[in-house]
Amino acid sequence: GVSSKFVPFKNNISSLDVGLADTDRLYELMTEKFSWDALARDDYFIDYQNLYTFLGVMSQRGLFTSMAHAFEKVGEMDRAVEMLDKCQEVMKNYPLETVCLGFSSNDYIVVEMVSMYYRLGQPEKARNLAVNLFNSLLESARFYLEFYEFAQDEFELCGQYIYFLQDEVRNGGDADLAKKIGNSFEALIDIATGGAAASDGSES
């Protein structure tokens, strides 16, 4: 709230939308005042408490993504891209997929980052992030499918995020990658069930 504007009417905010804000002050805080050097270090053990705090309770990806939204909203696209890039730099040691940790809202934020990269004219960055997230989701889905009797909810949640990611990649103009994402997941189901989910190469 340190850069929010005081206005005489309701300021509509959400988890990834800070509403009205002084973007110059916001940029100053994010680039000059605040530091994430400790979070970005790779010489300490990231235990569950760190994961729970920085991916869930005080989501750092959520922070950077909401800042990027604020800049995008007022047309400051370069600043928006800078926030997303900084997020990836700072959070490089933290997992992209967190269904197994119980706070999958992080996965939603990563998909939103992919979508934003496309909107901001950075398709290569969007593609790289999408592939990395998908690989993690597919690996988790494969594990949960093996123990489907006990992990049906987790498997289905992974599937929901895979299809959500596929939609955002397709909306970003990456039809080929979207098709690969859908077909790979359907092939996993096909192998497990002996069905023909992926035999015709159709997308979901």
Put a short name on every predicted segment:
Residues 1-204:
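ER/secretory pathway lumenal C-terminal domains and tails of membrane proteins involved
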